[in-house]
């Protein structure tokens, strides 16, 4: 005997369960969206409470009892994880967008229709963003940095100063520090 299979799902039943997992994860993560997003309270591995607005942290904490639903949630978690690896932020937005795309696919849209819809949407979003964009300067840099740190003013000022130091074409990267010390290091080159 090659192995024991405990649970098999096929066809529409499997599709419904996978999408149910996607819906559950989206509901948990989307509540944190944007500057007015809500905080989520959850347990860490030791059972201690954690309060966060970070989408990927919320996503990673979700484990669904039903293994097929959990597969759906895991698909969506990957979108959040990839976003945090590539961009460092925007995980909640990526989760909401990935949910919308998966919902279109779930509702029997053809692959071509889904692909064309995404392409059309990307063009429209880029055009819209270009039409409303304004240069970020002065105190706006401090405000944006502070918002991105969940309103930690001290850390926001530190990040804003780092961006001012490197200028428009410079790059700011963040790494965990040893000993929990927050500092800015400028590397030329």
Q: Residue spans of the language-model regions?
A:
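N-terminal glycine-/lysine-enriched basic segments
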Residues: 1-188
